[in-house]
Amino acid sequence: MAGPLPPLNQEPAFQKLQEYYDSKAKDLNIKDLFVKDSKRFSKYSLRLHTQNDGEILLDYSKNRINDEVWDLLLALAKVRRVNAARDAMFSGQHINITENRAVLHTALRNRGTDPVLVDDKDVMPDVRAELAHMKEFTNMVISGVWRGCTGKQITDVVNIGIGGSDLGPLMVTEALKPYGKGLHSHFVSNIDGTHLAEVLKKVNYETTLFIVASKTFTTQETITNATSAKTWLLEHSKEPESVAKHFVALSTNKEKVTEFGIDSTNMFGFWDWVGGRYSLWSAIGLSICLSIGFENFEQLLDGAHFMDNHFKTTPFEKNAPVILALLGVWYSNFFKAETHALLPYDQYLHRFAAYFQQGDMESNGKFVSKSGKPVKYSTGPIVWGEPGTNGQHAFYQLIHQGTRLIPCDFIAPAQTHNPIAGGKHHKILLSNFLAQTEALMAGKTVDEARTELSKAGLCGNELDNLLPHKVFVGNRPTNSIVVKKVSPFTLGALIALYEHKIFVQGIIWDINSFDQWGVELGKQLAKAIEPELDHCNEVSTHDSSTNGLINFIKANWK
């Protein structure tokens, strides 16, 4: 087995990129690159052909790259052993080194017949059994066979979870609303009682099903919310037996689940090789199944499996996740870009950026390498975004004319689920999608701005004073991803695309993308502070700021 990787900044392939950046990067003007190469779009774009959901287009031609840069980036991926790391993940090796675990969310959506081994055991029979359990339960609820404690059919589903037990199911349920089967979906994550209280105002105890998503069934926020929801149910039903009719668990802790009052036959399990932020493909996706039906959930799995196969089998130069990953490394480690914007031009995808805030920032927000040594280069970026065209009227100003370089991914469907006004809305939406990447690339020169102002009737000092404010530097990099339509299949493919992009970047940076120790420290301190809020005495056991905050809150508690 090959030894550890050298620090990235000591890698000869990285140093060659640094030399190129230092000497030639200032000459990489995207607009000029198109002028010089009439085939640039075809050279720097991919079309992925799906069986039933059309093509997926990735256009990465509007980036600050040329053939020389691209060859150097591909060479970097090879010397950082991305191939070997990818194979290790898919083969069930324990690549999560700090927790000594395999990383096999890909097994959850494996639609083939080949075994998937973890510690010499084929996990696929267990995966298929859990999917069958989810299918049976989903069909019972949607068909009305499963009923509440008073015999009424379920109309509302409340998913209680946090982090990966909330963000993924919420994002997918919102994205696939057009495929809904009639149940109303609600999500409660925040320990702030307002979140649960507002949901409970909208539902009827007789027709509501609660899903408690906690692997250990001990997650503080989730179990506190679930216990309060159970209290609310019992206040209305007056019957302890009603809990079993209105609660199911996504957990592996049978003892805690049954103690809560949930029938263990209504417990859906998953495994320690499923990370929270990759768990929507598992039983954590039960709320997705109940929203869109199990057949559509299978299509979601199919789409992800399609992208898994693409990632596994395609050479780097045509491999969509690798391409996105390398572009991100180029901007983060050489141009010092600190953020990356995800900008879906589809309102159904309004939670897509929030989902990958966790997916990316929790995975690659690390400052030590796998060997435990602090790195001396940038790792995970800040990920953010909002749907178009809302973002255009909020933060695009900074992307266009600010001092920071912000690489952006624009995502759009060619077809809409809602062609109202004869498709006029969608045509306007897509025209904005197309215009923004062109504008970010081309900008507006001084001469162009002067001509525009002259045509508007300005001249002299008035024109000269306004002129610099109307100039756009341009040369802002973007990727465009276009699907035929947002469907379960294409959404599954998009999610897997970004999962694998994040993985590849983690390999290049030599960090463990599959733990999240940064979540723990705040939890530990919160447990110490909580009892200090139970009494009215002043606190002096912390730093003066924390003491001051605690004492101010206690003084204003009532």
UniProtKB/Swiss-Prot annotation:
Q: Which GO terms describe its biological process?
A: gluconeogenesis; glucose 6-phosphate metabolic process; glycolytic process
Q: Where in the cell is it found?
A: Cytoplasm
EC no. given is: 5.3.1.9
Catalysis: reaction(s): alpha-D-glucose 6-phosphate = beta-D-fructose 6-phosphate
Domain of life from the UniProt record: Eukaryota
Stretches assigned to coiled coil? none
Q: Give the main localization category.
A: cytoplasm
What pathway is this protein a component of?
Carbohydrate degradation; glycolysis; D-glyceraldehyde 3-phosphate and glycerone phosphate from D-glucose: step 2/4
InterPro entries, sorted: G6P_Isomerase, G6P_Isomerase_C, Phosphoglucose_isomerase_CS, SIS_dom_sf, SIS_PGI_1, SIS_PGI_2
> Looking at the keywords, is Transmembrane helix present?
no
Q: Name one GO cellular component term.
A: cytosol
Instruction: Determine if Flavoprotein is one of this entry's keywords.
Output: no
**Catalytic residues (UniProt):** 362 (proton donor), 393, 523
Query: What does the record give under GO molecular function?
Result: carbohydrate derivative binding; glucose-6-phosphate isomerase activity; monosaccharide binding
Q: Which PROSITE patterns match?
A: P_GLUCOSE_ISOMERASE_1 (PS00765), P_GLUCOSE_ISOMERASE_2 (PS00174), P_GLUCOSE_ISOMERASE_3 (PS51463)
Q: Which UniProt keywords apply?
A: Cytoplasm, Gluconeogenesis, Glycolysis, Isomerase
Q: Which family does it belong to?
A: Belongs to the GPI family.
What is the protein named? Glucose-6-phosphate isomerase
**Species:** Drosophila simulans (Fruit fly)
Q: Which gene encodes it?
A: Pgi
